[in-house]
From Swiss-Prot:
Organism: Homo sapiens
GO biological processes: Arp2/3 complex-mediated actin nucleation; endocytic recycling; endosomal transport; exocytosis; regulation of Arp2/3 complex-mediated actin nucleation; retrograde transport, endosome to Golgi
Main location: membrane
Domain WH2: 343-365
Cited function: May act as a nucleation-promoting factor at the surface of endosomes, where it recruits and activates the Arp2/3 complex to induce actin polymerization, playing a key role in the fission of tubules that serve as transport intermediates during endosome sorting.
Family: Belongs to the WASH1 family.
Annotated positions of the Phosphoserine modification: S327
Protein's name according to its UniProt entry: WAS protein family homolog 6
Transmembrane segments: none
Localization per Swiss-Prot or TrEMBL: Early endosome membrane; Recycling endosome membrane
Gene giving rise to this polypeptide: WASH6P
Amino acid sequence: MAFHEMQAHKNALGTSGEQQAADITGPTPHQGGWKQVEQSRSQVQAIGEKVSLAQAKIEKIKGSKKAIKVFSSAKYPAPERLQEYGSIFTGAQDPGLQRRPRHRIQSKHRPLDERALQEKLKDFPVCVSTKPEPEDDAEEGLGGLPSNISSVSSLLLFNTTENLYKKYVFLDPLAGAVTKTHVMLGAETEEKLFDAPLSISKREQLEQQVPENYFYVPDLGQVPEIDVPSYLPDLPSIANDLMYSADLGPGIAPSAPGTIPELPTFHTEVAEPLKADLQDGVLTPPPPPPPPPPAPEVLASAPPLPPSTAAPVGQGARQDDGSSSASPSVQGAPREVVDPSGGWATLLESIRQAGGIGKAKLRSMKERKLEKKKQKEQEQVRATSQGGHLMSDLFNKLVMRRKGISGKGPGAGEGPGGAFARVSDSIPPVPPPQQPQAEEDEDDWES
């Protein structure tokens, strides 16, 4: 408002004479400075309007209870190209170019008159001692000045005002400051050890320093306990529409107890006994047993069995005799019949299915024996090539012992083949079938 009133007052008081003079002579430096002042004043007024607008917004927001999000730009809002700054005093003269008055002094120095000086010495006696003073042998400092000193800085001590040729102070970190003369400096020919430190001379024990730990150990610190209600109504300048979740996840401090998340549990598969094959979701019935051989031949040809196994075999033979007349022979049925309800029956059934015709890559015992012989020969050759040396023999024995302990050497079992042999040995023997059926089995395994 003050600016507008001043503009109106200026327009009312304007004279035509001044305008005519301005038109005739052109813009003066004073008028150019006035324009820049007006422009700066308008900029200040615009900034004031922005400030008042922001203040009004703040006053409007001050009493509300709603949460407000404020987004701020990363850069200050400014024009892409800044205006060049122009000085207000464009028409003013440079003060360095101004001429200043110079005054000449006509008086001169009077020449020195030696005669008048000699006459004054006659009237005013001056006593000057011309006798040389005796030199002090214990003079402090480094002695006389050398002839090659050309400046005061080379004469004085660095960054001080001390003249080393007059007084030289030697600083000893243990004994303190000692003033030495040039005679003492010349007399010091042999070096002496410094005094022992106080920790040795006075038998003082130094405290053991605890090593500092520079590793970062996060700490939650002391959290103040504030007992306030969950809902605080009618608080001034506090937003009441904020919603947050109490589950904020794990804390940032890894050393806090109880922050390790629990791992999910996995269901492990339980080893179940082998079952018979399923065809279309229905259990296949066991194949009908083949006609057994006559009982006297079985008893005559079979080896003597233990008493625990002889009774069930005899009972099975009698049952087979009763059912042999009614059940005809079926092609493809197994030649050996075992009680399907037992665990050995399921094991043998799985072995037959896994190692049937063309499924299992079985090796004969001859090939295994040949491989073992080759391995033994190679070990003997290595032993003979490295033999004759005590350390090599010890090394070979140690290797053989390690192989025996780990199960890879000759002293260990035969691996999975040996385990299978032990399982097959534990199965009770089955009476041998008829001769033609045994030949067919051998043909099937060989093919």
